[in-house]
């Protein structure tokens, strides 16, 4: 007798072993038809999986979150079958489900083309229509290596021989005549794959991610449970493309990058204004929350990086140089320099907490393939700060930091923030007692600020637990920016200490913290979040003043000058172009306000105001306009 317990608590007895599909059929024909997989005691399995002992079972349908990975994994297999049917001799390697889709890597001498993708997608449709049963088989390692070897599938032989652990059961999934090595699980048949997939792009990929190995051809695709979901995803991609910071940065003349300085940014005047506004704002927040700003050297001797542990653990990502028989490294992080400032004087417990902040310019030797506009660079600036405090001060310091962070994010237009608390890993420094106190302090600080959080057990760094803050932008994309990290290790390595109340020397707790993260990346996020429509306080040009004809040129100049004297970033267009052309051109620059002056405005000593989005605000006197603009800037709307 086998007893199966369902999610609603009901129990179904069976005389002997039973498959997931049979349980679904016993519940109802509708569920049997909708079943894509099962969860047996929490483990995702095929519908053909045999339950031979009492178990808990949930039937997985297209409505369940777990179904999406199954659908994407099956789409990858169907694509691989389509490729091998259309292009015999092509070798398949690996093809997993990934976020928003799937990919498969192929070994083929002739490169795939965009036209090939259309053919492959059409063949995938045909394979789905065939409704081929998908069956799981277990083969011996020797049998599998011989079969794939005879087929010329050298990559599969290597996977079986080197990647799959020797003691692991070797499963093969077969759909029609096509089969592949795979752990599964999979859908019951190709016909269960929703026709809501699309092949997206081609890329190169080294075998097993090693540049010493052969270059393979990767085909990316996306797959969803419903066509409506696919269409919504494609729409989001279109929106993301319109908002791409690389395109908008060029359109708005903010910055550029070039091959002579890979991963480094050339900031143009307009882009640098945005940078300066953000830096000035953060500097105000440093003062408001009791931080002291410092500056540390960009290049330090190898001995410093050896003491901090960076030379041993991070050297491949550091730019190094030598001079006068000494080795140096360009700093990849600011923390060792801040410890040196702390160590430069004797500190009492009364001096703590000590908060040191820096717009620290760092460089990391990121692989060229990982660089992406200003989102992933080699030279970047962090809004970095380190708090030196006593254990009993940690909770309050973290709580105050969270208040500061929430205010900053809200002012930049981000109100949806996800929080993760990562706790002790197996390998760590520090006592269990210290970790207990630290983790409790972080959790308490979050609760004090009314923040819910996802607990990530074992995901903390070896030197301390951390909180990560992730922003959700207008398109629903997630960007991890803020962090606060306890460090039990670096103060010890670099000899930081303070005089305690009992006159003994003690080691401070060090809190690493950032809100924006990399300034470059944060500006990239801002550009995409606002689609280049910077709020007034950040806009490089806040107001454009335009005359209709030469008669109003002097008045237009006087208006622009008055705005500048009032602290408004105003520009002037006195060109001979028609006013509609001027308005259209400056609208493409996404300016917050455009002021038009004609004869009527000049005579009445007013301006005609157009707000972004083609909003006609009518005529305003200059004093009223300046008051409005100043209020909007101060409110950071």
Swiss-Prot record:
This is Threonine--tRNA ligase. Catalyzes the attachment of threonine to tRNA(Thr) in a two-step reaction: L-threonine is first activated by ATP to form Thr-AMP and then transferred to the acceptor end of tRNA(Thr). Also edits incorrectly charged L-seryl-tRNA(Thr). Coiled coil: none annotated. Binds 1 zinc ion per subunit. Belongs to the class-II aminoacyl-tRNA synthetase family. SMART domains: tRNA_SAD. It catalyses: tRNA(Thr) + L-threonine + ATP = L-threonyl-tRNA(Thr) + AMP + diphosphate + H(+). Keywords: Aminoacyl-tRNA synthetase, ATP-binding, Cytoplasm, Ligase, Metal-binding, Nucleotide-binding, Protein biosynthesis, RNA-binding, tRNA-binding, Zinc. GO terms for molecular function: ATP binding; metal ion binding; threonine-tRNA ligase activity; tRNA binding. It is found in: Cytoplasm. Homodimer. Residues 244-535 are annotated as: Catalytic.
């Amino acid at each position: 007798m086998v007893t199966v317990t369902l999610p609603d608590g009901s129990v179904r007895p069976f005389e002997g072993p039973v498959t997931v599909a049979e349980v679904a059929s016993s519940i109802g024909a509708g569920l049997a038809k909708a079943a894509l997989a099962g969860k047996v005691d929490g483990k995702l399995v095929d519908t053909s999986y045999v339950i031979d002992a009492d178990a808990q079972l949930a039937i997985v349908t297209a409505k369940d979150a777990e179904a999406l990975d199954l659908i994407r994994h099956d789409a990858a297999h169907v694509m691989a079958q389509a490729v091998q049917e259309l292009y015999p001799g092509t070798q398949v390697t690996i093809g997993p489900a990934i976020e928003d889709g799937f990919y498969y890597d192929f070994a083929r001498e002739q490169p795939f083309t965009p036209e090939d993708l259309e053919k492959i997608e059409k063949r995938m449709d045909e394979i789905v229509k065939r409704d081929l049963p998908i069956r799981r088989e277990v083969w011996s390692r020797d049998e599998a290596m011989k079969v794939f070897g005879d087929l010329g599938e050298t990559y599969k032989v290597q996977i079986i021989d080197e990647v799959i652990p020797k003691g692991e059961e070797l499963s093969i999934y077969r759909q029609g005549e096509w089969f592949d090595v795979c752990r599964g699980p999979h859908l019951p048949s190709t016909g269960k794959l929703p026709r809501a997939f699309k092949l997206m792009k081609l890329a190169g990929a080294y075998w097993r991610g090693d540049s010493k190995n052969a270059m393979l051809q990767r085909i990316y695709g996306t797959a969803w449970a419903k066509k409506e979901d696919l269409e919504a995803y494609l729409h989001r991609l279109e929106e993301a493309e319109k908002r791409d910071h690389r395109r908008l940065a060029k359109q708005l003349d903010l910055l550029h990058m070039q091959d002579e300085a890979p991963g480094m940014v050339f900031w143009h005047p307009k882009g640098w204004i945005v940078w300066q506004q953000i830096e000035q704002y953060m500097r105000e927040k440093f003062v408001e929350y009791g931080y002291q700003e410092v500056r540390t050297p960009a290049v330090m001797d190898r001995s410093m990086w050896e003491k901090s542990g960076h030379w041993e653990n991070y050297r491949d990502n550091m730019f190094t140089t030598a001079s006068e028989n000494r080795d140096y490294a360009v700093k990849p992080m600011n923390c060792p320099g801040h410890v040196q400032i702390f160590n430069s004087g004797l500190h009492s417990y009364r001096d703590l907490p000590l908060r040191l902040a820096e717009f620290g310019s760092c460089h990391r030797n990121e692989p060229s393939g990982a660089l992406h506009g200003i989102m992933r660079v080699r030279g970047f600036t962090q809004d970095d700060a380190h708090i030196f405090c006593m254990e009993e001060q940690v909770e309050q310091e973290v709580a105050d930091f969270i208040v500061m962070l929430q205010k900053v994010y809200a002012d930049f237009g981000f109100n949806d923030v996800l929080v993760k608390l990562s706790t002790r890993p197996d390998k760590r420094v520090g006592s269990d007692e210290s970790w207990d106190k630290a983790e409790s302090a972080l959790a308490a600080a979050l609760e004090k600020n009314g923040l819910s959080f996802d607990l990530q057990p074992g995901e903390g760094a070896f030197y301390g637990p951390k909180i990560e803050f992730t922003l959700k932008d207008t398109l629903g994309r997630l960007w991890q920016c803020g962090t606060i990290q306890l460090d039990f290790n670096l103060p010890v390595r670099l000899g930081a200490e303070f005089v305690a109340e009992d006159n003994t020397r003690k080691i401070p707790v060090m809190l690493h913290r950032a809100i924006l993260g990399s300034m470059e990346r944060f500006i990239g996020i801002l550009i995409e979040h606002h689609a280049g429509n910077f709020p007034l306080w950040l806009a490089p040009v806040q107001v454009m003043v335009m005359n209709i004809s030469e008669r109003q040129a002097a008045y237009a100049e006087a208006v622009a000058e008055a705005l500048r004297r009032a602290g408004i970033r105003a520009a002037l267009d006195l060109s001979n172009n028609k006013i509609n052309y001027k308005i259209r051109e400056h609208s493409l620059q996404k300016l917050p306000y455009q002021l038009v002056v004609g004869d009527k405005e000049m005579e009445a000593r007013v301006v005609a105001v157009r707000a972004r989005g083609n909003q006609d605000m009518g005529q305003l006197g200059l004093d009223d306009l300046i008051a409005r603009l100043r209020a909007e800037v101060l409110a950071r709307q």
